[in-house]
Regions:
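Active-site rim beta-loop-alpha module in soluble metabolic enzymes
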Residues: 105-155
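Generic non-transmembrane alpha-helical segments
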Residues: 114-122, 171, 211-222
Length: 226
């Protein structure tokens, strides 16, 4: 998502460099603990994610982890919470161009497993659960704005709202690529990006970056041993 976050990820690499910054995509590559990785800032929403996936895969990528931010719905959730996605309610449109709405948007199990394992090894608290992803940031029917929609997602136990994971999971499934996602909460169920929570959010963002890098490293090493 955020271009600044892609740079933060790249800063953890030993020899990162800017590959390109064009048409809204900021792309960095480098090595993390000896493993070659790429960090790509895609902007907001499903269409830009789908394009990034297609073009990065054309260059050889086959495993994708979204490191993002999200809103939350459930009582007790707060800024900085780390959420590892087990699936996504499909409220966007881009994924429908690949597979029908009945097809579930879920991460690859091996990626999910390594993200959970990384969080536990790093002693980073986390939540796992299903979220919702849609295209309309200011849509009047969004759960944050429509009481009926909000009650539905609360009752369903959904733990996050963002704009990209439905596309990530469905496009990945269509092509046979491995995918996963985790987010740092940027608010509470009643406050969107409160000023008092900014420091906690930045801590959670850094936690997500660490978990993603450790998880990707584990996947790459397992591939090398296979």
């Amino acid at each position: 998502g955020d271009h600044a976050r892609a740079k933060k990820i790249a800063d953890h690499m030993d020899d990162s460099y800017l590959v390109t910054d064009s048409r809204g995509y900021a792309v960095y590559s480098g090595h993390y603990d000896g493993v070659f990785m790429t960090a790509c800032g895609t902007g907001m929403g499903g269409p830009t994610v789908a394009i990034a996936l297609e073009e990065l895969a054309h260059l050889g990528a086959d495993t994708f982890i979204r490191v993002g931010s999200c809103g939350v719905f459930q009582e007790g959730q707060k800024p900085g919470d780390v959420i590892i996605a087990t699936g996504t309610f499909r409220a966007g449109g881009t994924a429908n161009a690949y597979l029908p709405p009945e097809f579930p948007a879920v991460p690859t199990f091996t990626v999910l497993r390594e993200l959970v394992r990384a969080a536990e090894e790093l002693a980073i608290p986390y939540t796992v659960g299903v979220g919702i992803a849609g295209d309309a940031f200011y849509g009047p029917r969004k759960p944050q704005r429509d009481p009926q929609s909000r009650q539905m997602v609360v009752d369903a136990g959904l733990v996050s709202v963002e704009m990209e994971s439905d596309t990530l999971f469905v496009v990945g499934a269509y092509h046979g690529w491995r995918t996963g996602a985790l987010y740092a909460s940027d608010g509470t169920p009643t406050e969107i990006k409160p000023e008092w929570g900014e420091e906690d959010f930045r801590r959670g963002e850094e936690d997500c970056i660490q978990v993603a890098l450790h998880g990707m490293r584990a996947l790459a090493r397992a591939d090398g041993a296979a």
